[in-house]
Swiss-Prot record:
UniProt function note: Involved in oxygen transport from the lung to the various peripheral tissues.
Record note on quaternary structure: Heterotetramer of two alpha chains and two beta chains.
PTM sites of type Phosphothreonine: T12
Organism: Theropithecus gelada (Gelada baboon)
Gene name tied to this protein: HBB
Annotated binding of heme b, by residue: H63, H92
Tissue: Red blood cells.
Modified sites of kind N-acetylvaline: V1
Record's protein name: Hemoglobin subunit beta
Gene Ontology molecular function: any one: haptoglobin binding
UniProt keyword terms in alphabetical order: Acetylation, Heme, Iron, Metal-binding, Oxygen transport, Phosphoprotein, S-nitrosylation, Transport
SUPFAM superfamilies: Globin-like
Annotated Gene Ontology cellular component terms: blood microparticle; haptoglobin-hemoglobin complex; hemoglobin complex
Amino acid sequence: VHLTPEEKNAVTTLWGKVNVDEVGGEALGRLLVVYPWTQRFFDSFGDLSSPAAVMGNPKVKAHGKKVLGAFSDGLNHLDNLKGTFAQLSELHCDKLHVDPENFKLLGNVLVCVLAHHFGKEFTPQVQAAYQKVVAGVANALAHKYH
């Protein structure tokens, strides 16, 4: 992902304030609520029968934290996202058979959750930088698909 120095600074500065546990669970939960067909990848997570059940589900929260941990790692390797996410791309493609379009959906949901959490601090410039990053991460995660 090509970011200007200003964009990179905006992304890393805001990310330093992100509560990965909270935002990860909320982002994954919102994905599962807004795009219910994505729930099929999470059969083992138990009750996903309502928005309240999804948002309160400890397995959703735990996996959301894990997802955002990987995203954090990607922020440290913006110049090599494909390499950083190669194993996760392979896993999601070959073993889990996740539609790569879902990575874009999750990225967009993450941007919405960040905007919700940070309000005025999430300026149009910060949003534009994050849109570049989530698009780059989605592209890297889709890289191993054939």
